[in-house]
């Protein structure tokens, strides 16, 4: 599933920091250019290892897209929305943080929606390795949600700040895609604190739960 989210005002050269499990193919789809142009601009060849954190030259980029991989998997019955409780971050930094906390597979969420810090776009959706490998989450033990819920986190501390408009727009798009593909009813799209048995304020007191309800209910 792909959706254009912004035009760059004509072909321009930008830099993209490689996230966990990213591929040249996916990066090329993000910016609407060919894989070959990325290989050439960065002196890479197909099959060369991609180092997480390396900044790639993206030549002649014209737009930025959401690119969401979908997999046939009947285990996904819920979507649980979180905040990272950090003002800054991206998939790479939170992946490392979760490894340090003992999460053997790193980043505990399946998707991360960036807030424009740490080299990522405001509202950019990053797919975590857990999603690519279709692994259980490590985002909500309560009610056994790690085994049945897709974990979506927005970068930010929403006990202190509000999500950005771009983050909420991207969340709406992602929820629509996931709900449609996995036939998840609106009542099963919930904030972390709404999970039975969860003792947390996540996704924070300034997260617009009413808007989440409206978005899930409308399918937009």
Predicted regions and their residues:
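Short, charged beta-turn/beta-strand-edge "cap" motif at the junction between a beta-strand
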Residues: 61-65
């Amino acid at each position: 599933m792909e959706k254009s989210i912004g035009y760059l005002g004509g072909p321009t050269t930008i830099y993209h920091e490689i996230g966990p499990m990213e591929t040249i193919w996916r990066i090329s789809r993000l910016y609407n250019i060919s894989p070959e142009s990325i290989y050439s601009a960065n002196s890479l060849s197909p099959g060369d290892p991609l180092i997480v954190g390396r900044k790639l030259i993206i030549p002649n980029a014209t737009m930025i897209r959401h690119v969401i991989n979908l997999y046939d998997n009947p285990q996904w019955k819920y979507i649980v929305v979180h905040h990272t409780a950090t003002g800054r971050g991206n998939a790479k930094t939170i992946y490392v943080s979760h490894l340090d906390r003992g999460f053997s597979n790193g980043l505990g969420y399946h998707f991360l929606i960036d807030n424009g810090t740490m080299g990522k776009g405001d509202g950019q959706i990053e797919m975590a390795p857990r999603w690519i490998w279709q692994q259980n989450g490590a985002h909500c033990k309560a009610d056994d949600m790690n085994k049945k819920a897709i974990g979506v986190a927005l970068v930010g501390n929403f006990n202190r700040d509000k999500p950005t408009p771009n983050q909420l727009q991207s969340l709406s798009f992602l929820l629509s895609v996931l709900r449609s593909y996995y036939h998840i009813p609106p009542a099963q799209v919930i904030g972390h604190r709404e999970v039975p048995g969860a003792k947390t304020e996540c996704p924070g007191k300034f997260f617009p739960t009413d808007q989440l309800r409206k978005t899930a209910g409308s399918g937009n």
